[in-house]
């Protein structure tokens, strides 16, 4: 009984890991600014949202993404809804790519991700400048975009491994259900 309970907790943790990572990254402003590298930062929520929206995982739903954006605005001190809009724009681009893609390719996804974060950041910072008169350091934004783009490839590799583990877990749970049904018959 306890081993079954432990495995069910592990399965649940692995299934909800992208959601846990999303909220952990928006709550603590996942960044490497504490290393005192002036222009080294990357936007982990962009990578996470684009990848999991592209791969059609239902765990990371649009409602959770919207709420994570609201939390991100509160942490960063941005006007409410700006990050949510940016995150949903990224979801829209990922959904479009998912629907038009015949053969998925990490390399093509990677360059489409660059286009996506350029558009999303442009809209985000345009709104911040136009309506809220927030000063923007373009060198920091450029560094953030470049490092986010470069790190997408690395994180996509690890997310692919995690996705394969999740698919095995889902198939195992279906097999367990079939075995339980057979025992009842």
PLM regions with names:
Residues 1-185:
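Terminal, non-globular segments
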